Structures are given as structure tokens and as C-alpha cells.
Amino acid sequence: MTAPRIIQNPAELDALAGGCFVPTMGALHQGHLSLIRAAARSGDPVITSIFVNPTQFAPNEDFDAYPRPVDRDIKLAGEAGSDAVYLPSESSLYPEGREASIDLAASLPIPEVAKRPQLEDAGRPHFFGGVCLVVARLLEQVRPSAAVFGEKDWQQLQVIRAMVASDARFQGIEVIPGPIVRERDGLAMSSRNASIPSMHRERACGLANALDAAESAKTPADAESVMRTTLEAHQLAMEYAVI
């Protein structure tokens, strides 16, 4: 298999305009690779980006510690069907500088689905502004015909769909959802799973167990109740469990 083309200069993306785009923060796992394979099935050139985005991390979060195995990621992306791997510099995406870009992300008008009560924005009010800013700038540079995002981050997927649909710059870009890929024990694959201590792994699986338990509930209220009960039984600190 031919190694993917490595692109660092945004101008080099012009030759791949109209392709299928898979944005990632790297530390690729089988969930990411399933998105790249889905993009490859489109028959269009596949561009995978790797960029750990500072505007979606709060000061107390793990930006500096986030894994960055870039050489490994390039190899895996190519094996999964990526024709090019885009490695943007922070300055190419945020020419205004990091602090100014963080302030800009915080001030962006974001889709209403990002502000649903009791969901991600309640605990991480910075997050979706940062996601919308980086995705918008990547889409401007890559100019794809389609982009693939995972269903694991369900609210994020809906935010991106709403942003793309409402922004004239992105008309005609198809947002393709990619199914969740799980570990053998049911935990959704995530780049952060490697940081879960082995003694806490069973507790972490309470997330999947809570969703499984909710599936058989007769009403949304019953589903939320059984999710909370299951999460508490696994000794998990619950931020939200909402249908």
C-alpha cells in the first residue's frame, strides 16, 4: 500500500479539494480507522487531519498530556485508506495566536443543540465553541465534498451538522456519521482509554452498561432513572444522564 501524502502547507490541499475529510486529534484507534474506511468507500480522495486543538481544552484539562504518536498515526491512516494526512500548524489555523483564538471560540455564536440543558455545555462551556472554530477553519482549508464524524460524540455530531447546514461557506458539504466502535468489554474506543487505570476499567464500563440498561426502559424518564442507578452502582461521578 502506498504511504499517504503528508501535507503541512495548506496550499497543497488545493489538489485534493472535493475529497472526503476525516478530522482527528490523532492517537488513532479502530474507531478513527473505521471513519477513514468509511471515507474511502466514497471513492473520493481521503484526507485525514491530525491536530490537537487548544481552543476546545479548558486550562485544567489534558491538552499538554494528550497523546501525540504522529508517525504511528500516519502509518495507520494510510493503511486504513487515507490518501493524504494533513498536519496543520497551530499558526496556520489560528494566525491570531492561541489566546486570541481561545477568546474568539468563547465568543462564537454556536448552534442551539450545543446549549441543551444538562448536556456537555453545562460542564464544559468552552468546548463547542472551540470545536466549531477548528472544524470551520479546517473545512475552509480542505474544501471537501464530505466529512466523516463519529457517533460516539453524539452531541458534537449534531452541533457540526447544524453548523455546516447554517453556514453559507459550507453548503454542499455532506456530514457522514460513523458508528461507535467498542472495546471487547463494551467501552467505546477513545484515545483517552489508555489513561484509565486497570483497577478502574470495570467502573468505566458502567457507561456502556447504563446505555444498555436504558434501552429496555418504557419511557425517557425511566431510561434516565436506570442510567443514573447504573452509573451510581459503578461508582462513577455523574455529570449528566439525559435522553
Ranges and model annotations:
Residues 2-237:
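Nucleotidyltransferase catalytic core that binds NTPs
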